[in-house]
Amino acid sequence: MAEVGEIIEGCRLPVLRRNQDNEDEWPLAEILSVKDISGRKLFYVHYIDFNKRLDEWVTHERLDLKKIQFPKKEAKTPTKNGLPGSRPGSPEREVPASAQASGKTLPIPVQITLRFNLPKEREAIPGGEPDQPLSSSSCLQPNHRSTKRKVEVVSPATPVPSETAPASVFPQNGSARRAVAAQPGRKRKSNCLGTDEDSQDSSDGIPSAPRMTGSLVSDRSHDDIVTRMKNIECIELGRHRLKPWYFSPYPQELTTLPVLYLCEFCLKYGRSLKCLQRHLTKCDLRHPPGNEIYRKGTISFFEIDGRKNKSYSQNLCLLAKCFLDHKTLYYDTDPFLFYVMTEYDCKGFHIVGYFSKEKESTEDYNVACILTLPPYQRRGYGKLLIEFSYELSKVEGKTGTPEKPLSDLGLLSYRSYWSQTILEILMGLKSESGERPQITINEISEITSIKKEDVISTLQYLNLINYYKGQYILTLSEDIVDGHERAMLKRLLRIDSKCLHFTPKDWSKRGKW
């Protein structure tokens, strides 16, 4: 059995932790750092195959020293492409070599006629009106903004019809087929963390949200040990205290503080409560800077130009990076617009979440980063942010898609939103002359502003596309219909287009943003 003094960085051993059921478990963890406070050693551990947000400092009493694995000496191997620091390519980010070599793209059906009928008792289904935070990111932008973005390729789970192939849709008895069955070719994580989006997401005919104890998302964003560790202990923002999930590049002198104090209106940071109180006597903001372009009830959205409000935008990015691991933070906020969602009370407009987007996007991205702050998660705000981004796309007359890669929680939220939105369209179709209703992929995309590729991938994800008697059909099972109705009953927050006061700008004609 090893001694406590023998534990070094890189060691792996079981560590005691409490799971979501308040039960003890001993997952394997890696020691990332060791520190000594008043003669007492603390160890910063990362639980293997769990999300980094669960990393923590522990004492030696929680370590199983009997099963310790010491780090092996690394063999000298040539680096990738001869470049120091190169990492193995990620299968989630790289395009298959065969596709690159041939210069071909995956076939995407554009004009598919979808025909279907619903059970008689469901022909007239009242439209449900009515979601939690989301954790995806800001001027947090992907690592390669100016270079060509890598494409995330997902193998189709069901046959993809050609561009002109007709499709019909039939209902199925709920007992005949469950909503979504895992099939070869569909990437599906068995253990994913799910605290960001709505709990009701699992009820719309798609798999239940991942468990609370972590995900299989790999720590590939940063190689150096500093950025793999949380550096801020606690953040006080208004009436909330937040425990950061990830590293954020706040000034080094602030990382030793027990609490970092932020002004909830301008997001400036201070070392102490006294500093914050002095700042509040001078800060005259009671809402985010910029124009209020939406208000309904207590919910408002403010549009903020990253060039005109640089300080606020940078502070927003620093805060968001505490809860986003898959983006790189840049301080050049000029090319971005930020849309901040707030909740109003007698003291002012309190930030709930936000999303950012490029002023000019050649890839039709309508969201660069998106986040709902932890205190407001699981309350429907995640889908509200997503819905608002697509509402802006409708006004702009464009289809849009979120920038890749999405976080695990962001992907959950978008999958749920796409599924509910598309099912809402399909179930609202009325038959003409006794024939089954018909709709094309293009029409769905135009109605919802969801990009065609996302429409197709969602239909595949829900396992709705089938081949029947020489044509492609959409099959809505009883489980899908029932699950969708239950989900829509829980979705109380919706965007009202009548409350949106937004005029899109043509940034291509403005030279410098």
From Swiss-Prot:
Domain MYST-type HAT: 227-504
Modified residues (N6-acetyllysine): 52, 104, 120, 148, 150, 187, 189, 327
Keyword flag Secreted: no
Disulfide-bond pairs as recorded: none
Domain of life: Eukaryota
Cross-linked sites for Glycyl lysine isopeptide (Lys-Gly) (interchain with G-Cter in SUMO2): 430
Residues involved in acetyl-CoA binding: 370-372, 377-383, 407, 416
Phosphoserine sites (modified residues): 86, 90, 199
Disrupted-gene phenotype: Embryonic lethality before implantation. Conditional deletion leads to rapid hematopoietic stem cell loss in both fetal and adult stages. Conditional deletion at postnatal day 15 leads to impaired spermatid development: testes are smaller and show defects in the transition from the transition from round to elongating spermatids. Defects in spermatid development is probably caused by impaired acetylation of histones that affects histone replacement.
One MF term in the entry's GO annotations: histone acetyltransferase activity
GO terms for cellular component: cytoplasm; cytosol; kinetochore; mitotic spindle pole; NuA4 histone acetyltransferase complex; nucleolus; nucleoplasm; nucleosome
Interaction with ATF2, as annotated region: 368-513
C2HC MYST-type ZnF: 260-285
GO terms for biological process, alphabetical: apoptotic process; cellular response to estradiol stimulus; cellular response to glucose starvation; cellular response to glucose stimulus; DNA damage response; DNA damage response, signal transduction by p53 class mediator; DNA repair-dependent chromatin remodeling; double-strand break repair via homologous recombination
Glycyl lysine isopeptide (Lys-Gly) (interchain with G-Cter in SUMO1) cross-link, chain position(s): 430, 451
The protein's Enzyme Commission number: 2.3.1.48, 2.3.1.-
Function: Catalytic subunit of the NuA4 histone acetyltransferase complex, a multiprotein complex involved in transcriptional activation of select genes principally by acetylation of nucleosomal histones H2A and H4. Histone acetylation alters nucleosome-DNA interactions and promotes interaction of the modified histones with other proteins which positively regulate transcription.
Protein family: Belongs to the MYST (SAS/MOZ) family.
Protein known as: Histone acetyltransferase KAT5
Organism: Mus musculus
